[in-house]
Amino acid sequence: MGKTNSNQGYTQRQLRVGELVKQNLGEIFIRNEAKIPSINTKIITVTEVRMTPDLKTARAYVIPLGGEKMTETVSVLTEYSHLVRRALSKKLDIKFLPKIKFVEDNSFEYAEKIEKLIKKNKKNETEKKRYN
């Protein structure tokens, strides 16, 4: 059994395989090796891949360039995930090829929202100091 990463609860093996899948998905999208119709895969960024403990399922967090049409992009990737998986099988030499579930990556929107709240809080503190 692998060692557990204390801050996330993922094993080293999950992290290593996830990173390997992430790198290869990025290459597949850049080179359009999956030949997915109706979207330009060159504009898709894979921000993170999380593996299940049995390494049979990979959650790929994706975001299209500019964050536009995210829901549409994820639904097309999900529809053609068998093509992505086939392209991935040519690149990876692992016992079980994981099933890929594509997920919208909203972390940038979340970070932007937090940054706005921090700026608003700093502005309020500055105004309070000015009037005291």
Stretches with model-predicted labels:
Residues M1-T57, I63-N132:
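Charge-rich, low-complexity N-terminal segments
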